[in-house]
């Protein structure tokens, strides 16, 4: 059963509109039907700089090696001027999740 993917039109993350358009295009193409959350300095505004990385948490089944490689390739080849770190929800500890939960912003799902 295919799941419809919803992209937040204006997430509360500190990136420019054209960067959001490019990122959301990559996410919807590579992670259809998956919930994706942003967290870290780009959601809290603390110590964020122009080239600060963007942390994304992926829900659902773990990405296959192929899926992860294609996503990484698309992000690396994008015009985004910052690194995007992908974190798989199934690999984090309950303590880490509890720490980041207050700053998580849904960007797709």
Protein language model features and the residues they cover:
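Catalytic core of pol beta-like nucleotidyltransferases
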Residues: 1-35, 43-50, 59-109
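Short, well-ordered beta-strand segments
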Residues: 55-57
């Amino acid at each position: 059963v295919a799941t419809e993917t919803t992209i937040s039109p204006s997430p509360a993350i500190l990136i420019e509109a054209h960067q959001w358009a490019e990122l959301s295009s990559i996410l919807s193409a590579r992670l259809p039907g998956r919930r994706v959350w942003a967290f870290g300095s780009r959601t809290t505004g603390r110590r964020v700089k122009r080239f600060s990385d963007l942390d994304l948490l992926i829900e659902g089944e773990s990405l296959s090696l192929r899926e992860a490689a294609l996503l990484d390739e698309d992000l690396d080849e994008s015009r985004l001027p910052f690194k995007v770190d992908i974190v798989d929800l199934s690999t984090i500890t309950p303590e880490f999740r509890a720490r980041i939960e207050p700053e998580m912003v849904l960007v797709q799902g």
